[in-house]
Amino acid sequence: MTDTQVTWLTQESHDRLKAELDQLIANRPVIAAEINDRREEGDLRENGGYHAAREEQGQQEARIRQLQDLLNIAKVGEAPKQSGVALPGSVVKVYYNDDKSDTETFLIATRQEGVNEGKLEVYSPNSPLGGALIDAKVGETRSYTVPNGNTVQVTLISAEPYHS
């Protein structure tokens, strides 16, 4: 498994997501009972409560699958140990298109992790910018394509392990 297939999580984020998953799983019998109660009300074609409970069940099961998938590929508390290389879990500073005054600092991670709570912008390692920077060394310039089809050059100024 490569680092771009792994989701880096702080221990706090992992614990929060695991608690949410546990709560959703514990809630399964409640929704199942609600569906059963609504089913007993009669004609299912005109039973809004039944359909609402089924919709809620579908949304809950989708979130359970999403959390299970995320937690299965997560690296917990393993921020990159090295500085100078852009990896998932790194705070990077870059400039764009040879304009050294146009700098940006951000975290390479996934937004749903809940890391840094708005202190830094977060770019996924699977995004065009994040993907272009993975394994880049300080001073290295990479290119990526933006949604309008243009190519942007980005140069890595610094890369440090994330510390919450």
UniProtKB/Swiss-Prot annotation:
Q: Name one GO molecular function term.
A: RNA polymerase binding
Q: Does the keyword DNA-binding apply?
A: yes
Stretch forming the signal peptide: none
Question: Which UniProt key words apply to this protein?
Answer: Coiled coil, DNA-binding, Transcription, Transcription regulation
Say which domain of life the source belongs to.
Bacteria
| Biological process terms in GO annotation | DNA-templated transcription elongation; regulation of DNA-templated transcription elongation
Q: List where this protein forms a coiled coil.
A: 50-75
Q: Identify the InterPro entries for this entry.
A: GreA/GreB_C_sf (IPR036953), TF_GreA/GreB_CS (IPR018151), Tscrpt_elong_fac_GreA (IPR006359), Tscrpt_elong_fac_GreA/B (IPR028624), Tscrpt_elong_fac_GreA/B_C (IPR001437), Tscrpt_elong_fac_GreA/B_fam (IPR023459), Tscrpt_elong_fac_GreA/B_N (IPR022691), Tscrpt_elong_fac_GreA/B_N_sf (IPR036805)
Q: Which family does the similarity line name?
A: Belongs to the GreA/GreB family.
Q: What's the stated role of this polypeptide?
A: Necessary for efficient RNA polymerase transcription elongation past template-encoded arresting sites. The arresting sites in DNA have the property of trapping a certain fraction of elongating RNA polymerases that pass through, resulting in locked ternary complexes. Cleavage of the nascent transcript by cleavage factors such as GreA or GreB allows the resumption of elongation from the new 3'terminus. GreA releases sequences of 2 to 3 nucleotides.
Q: State the name under which the record lists this protein.
A: Transcription elongation factor GreA
